[in-house]
Every structure is written in C-alpha cells, then in structure tokens.
Amino acid sequence: MSRMQLYRRNGWGSAIVEAQLAHYGLDAEGVEVADLFLDPAARRELMRISPAGQIPVLILPDGRVMSESAAITLYLADMTGRDDLVPEAGAAERPRFLRWLIFLVAQVHPCF
C-alpha cells in the first residue's frame, strides 16, 4: 500500500482526523464504514482490522494500524513536523492543547 487509508463515517469520531489530513495536505483514501450499531457484519469486518471495532482507524502505508483519534492526531503532527495544529513538545501551549484533545475524545465523542 502506498497511501494511508482512513476508515471513517460521517458524524462519527473520524472528523478530527479528516480535518487534520486535509489541513496538512496528506493523501489518504477514505474507506466508508456502515453504521456499526445497525450492521453486525460491518462491525466484524472492522474488528478484523482493529480489534476495538471503533472509528477512526488509520492504516499507514507500511500496513501498521492506528486507532484512537487522539493518538492519530499526535502521530500526524509528528509525521509532518508541523506545529500549526498541534503544539510541539515543550511549547507553552502544549499542556492546554493536550487537555482539550483528551476532553474532546473522552467527553464529546462518546455523545455521538
């Protein structure tokens, strides 16, 4: 595989990763996932890729699998070396950013 694949669904937890990929100009194939609550086969298929069976899942070009939007967000920032979305380690803004990132994934995403 030469490009990343993002397993996604509109209105689910993949939005932050999609926005970040677009902002950084990174190429990723979007793989639309059916409603995991209504389609047991879709959940089983996703669980073959990522045992948690949650969206988002990012498949890296070398085949490694990433899940958890916060982890993907930090990885993409590290990969690009840019700090315009994610403050670099040691930056004064980093603690506040991390607090809001974790708040988003722990408190807001579960509501969707």
Language-model-detected regions and their locations in the chain:
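GST-like domain detector, emphasizing the conserved glutathione-binding G-site
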Residues: 1-112
